[in-house]
Design a protein with these regions (language model features):
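Class I Rossmann-like S-adenosyl-L-methionine
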Residues: 1-188
């Protein structure tokens, strides 16, 4: 059962702060702890990271523009679409839980709308994934395309790739010993 402190509700608030109020994601407060905190941050950071791609998917599926007071529903659709397209969360659970968030934020009238848009995205997921997208603002795509006409697609694609994790070992720690410890923990 979701409540106002659930991971998805917290993630929605963070997404709204960034998308609607132009605040930084690091300014967003995550007032929960443990696994819920990790899940909320994962949803918020992922939704923001792929915001432009998700926005391009959602916008044509909304027949009438949302009123300013209901733009949080657009953010909720971004959150739901992110779960469907970019995570291994069950599609049914992603849609159902996103619809439940609409009730928690006092917009039960929007549940059918949220459900319909997300089910449409789920049905077309294969086409969406196979289509070319860069998840960058259009002004940046134009600039990179102008400056690097031969390589812009590779540049934008690589820029979307998740950065590898690097670990720096303090000089006072034996590097080989530390590497053994990581291997024992099955971290490679």
């Amino acid at each position: 059962m979701l409540n106002k402190d659930s991971a998805r509700v917290i993630a929605l608030k963070a997404i709204c702060l960034v998308a609607l109020e132009k605040r930084s994601l690091s300014e967003s407060l995550f007032p929960i702890h443990g696994d819920d905190l990790s899940f909320a941050k994962s949803l918020a950071f992922g939704s923001i990271r792929f915001y432009h791609h998700l926005n391009d998917i959602i916008t044509p599926r909304i027949k009438k523009p949302l009123e300013k007071k209901n733009l949080d529903l657009h953010c909720l659709l971004v959150l739901g679409a992110y779960q469907i397209i970019y995570t291994d969360i069950s599609k049914h659970a992603a849609i159902n839980e996103t619809v439940e968030v609409a009730k928690i934020i006092d917009k039960p009238w929007a549940t059918g709308f949220i459900n319909a848009v997300l089910r449409g995205i789920d049905r077309e997921q294969k086409v969406i994934i196979e289509s070319k997208h860069f998840s960058h603002p259009s002004w940046l795509i134009k600039k990179i395309k102008k400056d690097y006409p031969e390589d812009y697609e590779n540049i934008l694609t690589e820029n979307n790739r998740k950065a590898p994790l690097s670990i720096r070992v303090h000089p006072s720690i034996d590097r080989d010993e530390f590497q053994k410890e990581l291997e024992e923990l099955n971290i490679h």
